[in-house]
Amino acid sequence: MAIITGNLVATELKFGIVCARFNDFINDKLLSGAIDTLVRHGASESDIDTAWVPGAFEIPLVAKKMAESGKYDAVICLGTVIRGSTTHYDYVCNEAAKGIGAVSLQTGVPVIFGVLTTENIEQAIERAGTKAGNKGSECALGAIEMVNVLKGL
């Protein structure tokens, strides 16, 4: 029986990051966490490209273009959606999640979901480098591992 695992070595891997501008005071921290983690695991900063989009809803299209380009081993999607007083939150969260998941399945490229979906600003801040760690960093680890798992198949 074969057991296939992915290591956390990012040397010579190329990463695309799609980051939403809306709620950038949170997303900047997610992006910094992702880049720092990729570099700490061997990626070169010159092998990391970041595309900024208006908001979480726009992430899937740019993620798809990056994944289809053949330039990237993985794409990391970062954003923050904070619940407000309308149903807009539900639509944005659902469509971003479905779109990002579909890109990975359609292209065969690991596309990592790093869009925070929180009830309030405090929860978002906690997940961007305080009490609950940095989800951008966690997504970078997931991207590295998935690339290496796929290489082992």
Curated annotation (Swiss-Prot):
It comes from Glaesserella parasuis serovar 5 (strain SH0165) (Haemophilus parasuis). It catalyses: (2S)-2-hydroxy-3-oxobutyl phosphate + 5-amino-6-(D-ribitylamino)uracil = 6,7-dimethyl-8-(1-D-ribityl)lumazine + phosphate + 2 H2O + H(+). Keywords: Riboflavin biosynthesis, Transferase. HAMAP family: Lumazine_synth. This is 6,7-dimethyl-8-ribityllumazine synthase. The gene is ribH. GO terms for cellular component: cytosol; riboflavin synthase complex. Belongs to the DMRL synthase family. GO terms for biological process: riboflavin biosynthetic process. Catalyzes the formation of 6,7-dimethyl-8-ribityllumazine by condensation of 5-amino-6-(D-ribitylamino)uracil with 3,4-dihydroxy-2-butanone 4-phosphate. This is the penultimate step in the biosynthesis of riboflavin. Forms an icosahedral capsid composed of 60 subunits, arranged as a dodecamer of pentamers.
